[in-house]
Amino acid sequence: MEFIPAQTYYNRRYQPRPWTQRPTIQVIRPKPRRRRPAGQLAQLISAVSRLALRTVPQKPRRTRKIKKQKQVKQEQQSTRNQKKKAPKQKQTQKKKRPGRRERMCMKIENDCIFEVKHEGKVTGYACLVGDKVMKPAHVKGTIDNADLAKLAFKRSSKYDLECAQIPVHMKSDASKFTHEKPEGYYNWHHGAVQYSGGRFTIPTGAGKPGDSGRPIFDNKGRVVAIVLGGANEGTRTALSVVTWNKDIVTKITPEGSVEWSLALPVMCLLANTTFPCSQPPCAPCCYEKKPEETLRMLEDNVMQPGYYQLLDSALACSQHRQRRNARENFNVYKVTRPYLAHCPDCGEGHSCHSPIALERIRSEATDGTLKIQVSLQIGIKTADSHDWTKLRYMDSHTPVDADRSGLFVRTSAPCTITGTMGHFILARCPKGETLTVGFVDSRRISHTCMHPFHHEPPLIGREKFHSRPQHGKELPCSTYVHTTAATTEEIEVHMPPDTPDYTLMTQQAGNVKITVDGQTVRYKCKCDGSNEGLITTDKVINNCKVDQCHTAVTNHKKWQYNSPLTPRNSEQGDRKGKIHIPFPLVNTTCRVPKARNPTVTYGKNRVTLLLYPDHPTLLSYRAMGRIPDYHEEWITSKKEISITVPAEGLEVTWGNNDPYKYWPQLSTNGTAHGHPHEIILYYYELYPTTTIAVLAAASIVVASLVGLSLGMCICARRRCITPYELTPGATIPFLLGILCCVKTAKAASYYEAATYLWNEQQPLFWLQLLIPLSAAIVVCNCLKLLPCCCKTLTFLAVMSIGARTVSAYEHATVIPNTVGVPYKTLVSRPGYSPMVLEMELQSVTLEPTLFLDYITCEYKTITPSPYVKCCGTAECKAKNLPDYNCKVFTGVYPFMWGGAYCFCDAENTQLSEAHVEKSESCKTEFASAYRAHTASVSAKLRVFYQGNNITVSAYANGDHAVTVKDAKFVIGPLSSAWSPFDNKIVVYKGEVYNMDYPPFGAGRPGQFGDIQSRTPDSKDVYANTQLILQRPAAGAIHVPYSQAPSGFKYWLKEKGASLQHTAPFGCQIATNPVRAVNCAVGNIPVSIDIPDAAFTRVTDAPSVTDMSCEVASCTHSSDFGGAAVIKYTASKKGKCAVHSLTNAVTIREPNVDVEGTAQLQIAFSTALASAEFKVQICSTQVHCSATCHPPKDHIVNYPSPHTTLGVQDISTTAMSWVQKITGGVGLVVAIAALILIIVLCVSFSRH
């Protein structure tokens, strides 16, 4: 809140006044102000009187001709004056009168802005806004006002702003500010500013460095923004500003913005005297005049911030302004030269000193382009002039030109050269294990150099294609941009060493003659004492032999690359220079192909994909539940794959296409409202395990009951026929024989049996007569009681729970954390009509709190030119460099192309150095290691409230309240404190990986984190690459070493799939900032505070009566596949809320209009085969019963909008069949039990 000025109104004086120290209020005299209107009136009266008495001048045409003739005479008199006056006329034409907007801004600025000066130069401005003085933080200097310069400013790096409280006596000069910014045109010092699409733009050229801090005003003179800088976008320039949005400060920074503070002069040093780097002293002031002294001056200032300004100034000797072109980019190469260096394989299997030695091969670009550094120079001729068609190479001691057309690069096949400049070549090459560069010189001789190098073009995307398609998808990648302009990348150069050349010496009798050939030669002879020196003319050394002398050519007028294949200049030591190099690595987009869409066949809980890859294409899929079960496979030919679709959904990614998402539906071949075998098939396909278990248990129970019934019948039969079997000559009655299946010799008639029982056993006669009647009574009672049991079973199966209601305006509910599925809640309040609230999650974002431990990337090994100490011993010095190694090797005898480098045989030593730095690619190709802490959850919620759909965003923490019209919603916290991110994560190019990386300062060679830095631009670097210097080979000058491979590049190959593809619950992972979006896990509680005015009293709402519900059609587990028609009678016209009191049924309409006697149709969605639900309209409820059929589609591409209760539904038809089967089995058991009871009673009565 420090950067939001308080709004105070003060009357402004219209006449501007100079900025001086303000006197106290008592000193200001108001008398001149009271007299000012009278003076103005007198001036107005006199001006009107002069205008009235003024006469029209006569013959105006003649006077104009006279003026014209005078001009012609003046032109004819002096042609020199005419030439001098012409530029003055142009200057007067450029000087335009300020427009209305500029005049108004200048008038306001005279009071409210102050210059910020540094060493007498204006670097920017400070502005008085409200009760604060504001100044851009990047503007260096002090405010040009004694009172304001003393203030203590508070700094905000986030907004690039500094502010302080305005002194009391200056508050009247401050401008008001506003957060109201309708699109249109605003005013600033240089004219109009257009505000559109949340951006401020001006015509290109209207603003410049030094304008930082200027305010932008509206037409009322209020400040709407403060300018910080701008970004050139062609004809328009987008402004970087600080502005206000209600109670928040906002910084708008277009891409590519540059700060508009006036650059301060950078100072350089020469002989303990400082001077501006852009204006070097006259001695030396130009490389062309004094090359050696100029290079020395540059080496002295190589670490100064203005080194490149000094280099440009020293090379641009001409004082007049030159037109910039591509040649200026090559101007720096006139201070350098090509060189000869050692090559391990010059094309015939042997080493040599090659003019096209390979220094470095860079392959960081993900588009497969190689950047090759060689010892020759391309695009520069020997005369230091620019020529695209030429290259220059070192032949002996002098550079020689050759045609660029003879340059070639190859791996396993010829490469395509896409760019060349200086020491660098850009080429696109096929895969191979070696790389060869070469050229044909002017004598038609081919020079080549081959290095072992494993090259395989990297994979972009998920398809291994060979050529860029015409149409496809743009993916982020990196490439070497084809520009020869100065970049941030640089190489080190130094003075070349003395090059030995024994051909300069000839033996003449007993003397040695040294022929210099116009060169500077250093010689040393061991004959008749020490004889050494530096000569530019031929010299004869008497009484000496060639074997006793050593000659070397010295050239200190040019730099050469600091190569490990050439020795360091022994006199210069560590002195060096720097030059920019072309073709920087930048982030861009690459077009990749999109695989043909697969042929998709839907099955029951399965999806079958028929794939047609044009080239190897990656197929991956994951479940969107708790266990993602991620799989991936490279498809190289036509293939059919069948994948199971879980209930939570399936995400399939084919090639570079966007992911396909599938959800299963409760489809089946049977029906829940058919015959038993169809019902069994229906439930078996939906719930196979449960169906088998239920059928097995039911079969066991039925079999047990039937067996029990048979046992009771057998027991009763035995009891009945035993007395007749034991009685000789007894005759079994006819009816008993039929019931007990007993064979009789003579069957008695029913009349005879009845007569016998009447005479002998009258109780048995009555019992036998009541058996059919008892059976009928038992069956009727069983059928009567079965529905009661079935209602209990149905309740347990369906578990339909009514919606929660409250008796107050404070309402709480819980919605599932599923995006795109609407949820409704009913708010009932006594005395008021019920209110329906519909809520739908648009998105849910889980954002962890991150702490950056470090970034890691590919390293480069810096091996400076070795220092060879001839006839002596070199010593290592400690240096604070990452992974620094230094070793001194004795007994070396290095050779250069002209002979032995040293005069001694065995007393020479070589000092080899090496250390590690971040590669140039680290600015674009790096991975960030973060520690993740507590995550914050925010939700975007669509609320249907009072007939309006309103979308709000809030933190789901249970504390943050958002207002929807006049109601307050508090969301969260989530029921599950779950996050897809581990405690340690790695972010690389928009992808996130869970990884237990090593801490800062504990990296291991060849693994992730072998080189670490706080940020991509920071200088603090930790490295552990197992760098070990090795002894150089005999005769060669080089710096061999052993080192572990880059852990970053190894991690890129082995990192696997990112969280975007493997996160559970269907999370979508995004970066900038790192977050997980739409994770379908847990529930979100919502607390709603609804004011009394939002409710409608029962007396004001229509009364609905005579309601009836009829379901026209119903398809369960489908997107609102049910349609119900409700007939009603309303007391008056009005609007009623519609709500389902059953959680298993969701109604699409939140409210309906009712009037008179009519009917309305509602759409509902349910997962039940037999839906029994209540619909409430206003305060009246109606019961609906639906017989739903399964959907025809097995798979859909959207989640179900209904609530899944997690239990199996039993249809009414299935329940009726269960009742029938249960009743039949129960009847059989009851009859068998009754028979057994009667038989037992009769047999016990006999005894």
From Swiss-Prot:
Cytoplasmic side: 713-747, 784-787, 1245-1247
Enzyme superclass (EC): hydrolase
Top-level taxon: Viruses
Positions of region (Ribosome-binding): 98-112
Region ranges (Transient transmembrane before p62-6K protein processing): 720-740
Start and end residues of each stretch annotated as Binding to the viral RNA: 83-113
Alphabetized UniProt keyword annotations: Capsid protein, Cleavage on pair of basic residues, Disulfide bond, Fusion of virus membrane with host endosomal membrane, Fusion of virus membrane with host membrane, Glycoprotein, Host cell membrane, Host cytoplasm, Host endoplasmic reticulum, Host Golgi apparatus, Host membrane, Host nucleus, Host-virus interaction, Hydrolase, Ion channel, Ion transport, Lipoprotein, Membrane, Palmitate, Protease, RNA-binding, Serine protease, T=4 icosahedral capsid protein, Transmembrane, Transmembrane helix, Transport, Viral attachment to host cell, Viral attachment to host entry receptor, Viral ion channel, Viral penetration into host cytoplasm, Virion, Virus entry into host cell
Motif Nuclear export signal, residue numbers: 143-153
Positions of the UniProt region annotated as Host transcription inhibition: 36-67
Site-annotated residues for Involved in dimerization of the capsid protein: Y186, N219
Marked site positions, Cleavage: W260, S261, R324, N325, A747, A748, A808, Y809
Segments on the Extracellular face: 325-691, 748-762, 809-1223
Residue ranges constituting the Peptidase S3 domain according to the UniProt record: 112-260
Enzyme Commission number(s): 3.4.21.90
Domain-related comment: Structural polyprotein: As soon as the capsid protein has been autocleaved, an internal uncleaved signal peptide directs the remaining polyprotein to the endoplasmic reticulum.
Official protein name in the record: Structural polyprotein
